[in-house]
Amino acid sequence: TISWHGCGSLRLAYSEDEMDWLRQTLSVGSALGFNIELVGTDQIARLHPFYNLDGVLGALYTPDDGHVDPSNVAMALAAGARQLGATIVRRCRATSIRPAADAGWAICTEQGDITCEHVVNAGGTYARQMGEWTGHVLPMTSMTHHYLVTETVPQFEDLKDELPVIRDDQQVSGYIRMEQKKCLIGIYEKTNPNTVWEDHCPWDAENELFTTDYDRIMPWLENTFERMPILAGLGISREVHGAISHPPDGNPLIGPAPGRRNYWCCCGTQIGIGWGPGLTRELARWMVHGSADV
């Protein structure tokens, strides 16, 4: 099981410029066959009666959207890969990558060397320093992201259906969704971002988390409580403050790296759980057939 919650999502717009962007996204999504529609405040209120819609002009509603447990997805993908013949070696750090004599690649690891025809740099926060092994300069940095989980929300207790995820870039700088009968608030600090590991991510870091910086996120948290007043009097049951790799333009670094045959990048994917399946499918097609379908 991957714990999929198909609750849908609403991406809000507060200005005509934002509405134009939603219309453009609607056009692209509809052309690709997605179930997606532009809705007004009356329908938003029906879908999510606890959200303050002052100033909201409309939203992009994606009924088939939702959220999922990333660790469960990773385990399911690993199981599928093993069924197709892949070997996954855990607790085995790569220490260098170098060209092999047969025009392939030699990867040195803590458990011995591996030779291969293709190599994919999917190193996450380590991708930049791994790229240095082969002379590649990958433009990316690690920026921190908070999410907080409230105590149980009394108004959620009797809900039959899960509320749609709210994506409110202007007021929350992130997203708000149900976490069972609690509420999860994810904040991307776009006006005062914080970077870590400017030189290199420590090799011994594992699920590295940082102290919650309430001073930095407080303006967004206050906005959240104004938008969802039912959360204002609740305590916080869980705090998470971790690093995510970001390229300068927000787009993933994917495809063949220049100057090196059969060296591929799949990194800088700041929305890993959302982009991962599609990006890796297209990268695999690119590697096998010489081009992607998009």
Where in the sequence are the language-model features?
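Flavin-dependent oxidoreductases
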Residues: 97-211, 222, 227-228
